[in-house]
Regions:
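Alpha/beta enzyme core
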Residues: 1-60, 65-87, 92-171
Length: 171
């Protein structure tokens, strides 16, 4: 059996900068920087090497608003160099960083399990129905405006969920 002989589920097309993903477009290669996002020169250099090696998309971590703004500077530097690779902000536990990144990069990756909630401390939490409804409302009050900002700036959103980054509320 050939690794090139496979079937794909039908999907929609999504734009990440100038890169189209999904539907009948080829599977895209994404890499991730291991530089400090606040080191603009080193991050731009590595992103440029990643693009030259054949990646279609590059992801950087944005722990806070400062890193999210740095990604905008990295993007400007890459465009100045003629490198068009779209950038993805990898966000965990910090909706303010997600809001900042939405205006700076082509895609923001968030985890809805920790978008508003604090990091896990592995506590068993018990909620009344009323408390749980308030928690969900908190998420809706933050997530809705985030999606609206992304729509306004044509910023793609990847919702990534994995067990290790779910909040205590979900667990």
């Amino acid at each position: 059996m050939s690794v090139f002989d496979y079937n794909r589920r039908p999907t929609s097309t999504t734009r990440v900068g100038d890169v189209l993903i999904g539907s009948d477009y080829p599977v895209r290669l994404q890499s991730m920087n291991n530089t400090s996002t606040n080191d603009i020169a080193a991050s731009a250099d590595q992103a440029e090497r990643i693009a030259a090696a054949g990646a279609d998309i590059d992801r950087l971590t944005a722990q806070g608003e400062r890193e999210a703004r740095s990604m905008g500077e990295i993007r400007k530097e890459l465009r100045r160099r003629g490198c068009q690779i779209p950038l993805v902000a990898d966000i965990h536990f910090n909706p303010k960083a997600a809001f900042a990144a939405a205006t700076e990069v082509e895609k923001v990756r968030i985890n809805p399990g920790n978008f508003v909630d604090p990091g896990r401390v592995f506590k068993q939490l018990e909620y009344t129905d009323e408390e749980y409804a308030r928690e969900l409302q908190k998420i809706e009050d933050t997530f809705g405006p985030f999606l609206e900002l992304c729509r306004k700036h044509s910023t793609a959103v990847r919702i990534g969920v994995n067990h290790g980054s779910l909040s205590d509320r979900i667990m």
